[in-house]
């Protein structure tokens, strides 16, 4: 009986469900008081994300508080980098810093293939514990950064406003960049397989910075490597739903659907009805409520969620934000988001 499986897993597979499942990107994090208290005692982000007890606890915090339909591993897209020979740190309020940015062929040649069982055992442990804890009340989600976004961080050395260093590499030394992207695609595919084998039931690939690319460059530097990751994972795990999210994706939505993923996660700058019209019927849709709406009134939050769900009616839909929840969001408004999502049928029938 598939009815005993988590709602989010069934919906992501395209099965008929009685409402869209609901979870939030970054649902474990700074907006929650319990997270901030834990952070005060453990100020290192890498410790919080790489110590299995802390990562498990943080992953479970929103589940205990809000009972979302998905529980996502608390980690970071850069977590696998040290396993490939790239050290990094995450500085509070500044973001990631790569100690030795990758700029030469010699550096690319020294990168190691990722062996997640060896370098990331804590990830497997946390995913297994999450599955044990949430049982079928929620689906356990794993995630990775896509090759272009990982390359953007390791070439730039930090977050960037215009990505001029990696774009210079793309337009001056494309062969070098392709070698780096290919290395990441193979390693990230192995990492996703490891997450699935450890307990992840649905996985999401974040290509956060692919929205900085023109469509022609998306076709050259992002899409082929997204597709390579998907193809490699689907060879061994064809039934695990895969989601692709890009921030600022309005110009490449149709291209996202061609990578082989099961679900395209829309950001909030695209009208849900237009997003649905631009995607083939076999592709599921996740999103796409503006995270800023969670600073509004409960009535406004409800209205916006109802609008989003109604526009996605008839499609395989997972209710989510169009970006991660923002720091400073009132916790009670996050609760309104989850409760509205879970009570959506009653709310729509009463309109």
UniProtKB/Swiss-Prot annotation:
Q: Does the keyword rRNA processing apply?
A: no
Say which domain of life the source belongs to: Bacteria
The Swiss-Prot or TrEMBL record describes its family as follows: Belongs to the uroporphyrinogen decarboxylase family.
Pathway assignment: Porphyrin-containing compound metabolism; protoporphyrin-IX biosynthesis; coproporphyrinogen-III from 5-aminolevulinate: step 4/4
Q: Where is this site: Transition state stabilizer?
A: 76
Q: From the Swiss-Prot or TrEMBL record, give the protein name.
A: Uroporphyrinogen decarboxylase
The enzyme's E.C. designation: 4.1.1.37
Q: Which organism is it from?
A: Prochlorococcus marinus (strain SARG / CCMP1375 / SS120)
One GO MF term on file is: uroporphyrinogen decarboxylase activity
Please give the GO cellular component terms listed in this UniProt entry. Answer: cytoplasm
Relate the protein's function as given in its record.
Catalyzes the decarboxylation of four acetate groups of uroporphyrinogen-III to yield coproporphyrinogen-III.
Q: According to its UniProt record, where is this protein located?
A: Cytoplasm
CDD domains for this protein = URO-D (cd00717)
Tell me, what is an example of a GO biological process annotation in this record?
protoporphyrinogen IX biosynthetic process
Q: Which InterPro entries match?
A: UROD/MetE-like_sf, Uroporphyrinogen_deCO2ase_HemE, Uroporphyrinogen_deCOase
* Coiled-coil stretches: none
* Subunit structure as annotated in this protein's UniProt entry: Homodimer.
């Amino acid at each position: 009986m598939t009815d005993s499986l988590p709602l989010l897993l069934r919906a992501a597979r395209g099965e008929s469900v009685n409402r869209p499942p609901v979870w939030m990107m970054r649902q474990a994090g700074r907006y929650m008081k319990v997270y901030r208290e834990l952070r005060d005692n453990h100020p290192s982000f890498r410790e919080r994300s790489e110590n299995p007890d802390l990562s498990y606890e943080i992953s479970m915090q929103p589940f205990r508080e809000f009972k979302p339909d998905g529980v996502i591993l608390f980690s970071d897209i850069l977590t696998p980098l040290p396993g490939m020979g790239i050290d990094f740190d995450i500085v509070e309020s500044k973001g990631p810093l790569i100690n030795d940015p990758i700029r030469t062929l010699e550096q690319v040649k020294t990168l190691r293939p990722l062996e997640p069982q060896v370098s990331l055992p804590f990830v497997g442990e946390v995913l297994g514990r999450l599955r044990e804890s949430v049982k079928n009340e929620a689906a356990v989600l794993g995630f990775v950064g896509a090759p272009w976004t990982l390359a953007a961080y390791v070439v730039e050395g930090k977050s960037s406003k215009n990505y001029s260093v990696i774009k210079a590499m793309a337009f001056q030394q494309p062969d070098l960049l392709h070698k780096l992207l290919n290395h990441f695609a193979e390693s990230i595919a192995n990492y996703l397989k490891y997450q699935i084998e450890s307990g992840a039931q649905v996985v999401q690939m974040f290509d956060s910075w692919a929205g900085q690319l023109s469509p022609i460059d998306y076709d050259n530097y992002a899409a082929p490597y997204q597709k390579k990751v998907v193809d490699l994972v689907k060879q061994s795990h064809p039934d695990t739903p895969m989601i692709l999210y890009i921030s600022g994706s309005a110009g490449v939505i149709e291209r996202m659907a061609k990578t082989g993923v099961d679900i395209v996660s829309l950001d909030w700058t695209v009208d849900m009805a237009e997003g649905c019209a631009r995607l083939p019927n076999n592709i599921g849709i996740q999103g796409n409520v503006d995270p800023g709406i969670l600073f509004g009134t409960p009535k406004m939050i409800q209205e916006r969620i109802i609008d989003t769900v109604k526009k996605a009616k008839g499609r395989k839909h997972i209710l989510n934000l169009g970006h991660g929840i923002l720091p400073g969001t009132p916790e009670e408004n996050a609760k309104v988001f989850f409760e509205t999502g879970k009570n959506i049928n009653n709310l729509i029938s009463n309109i």
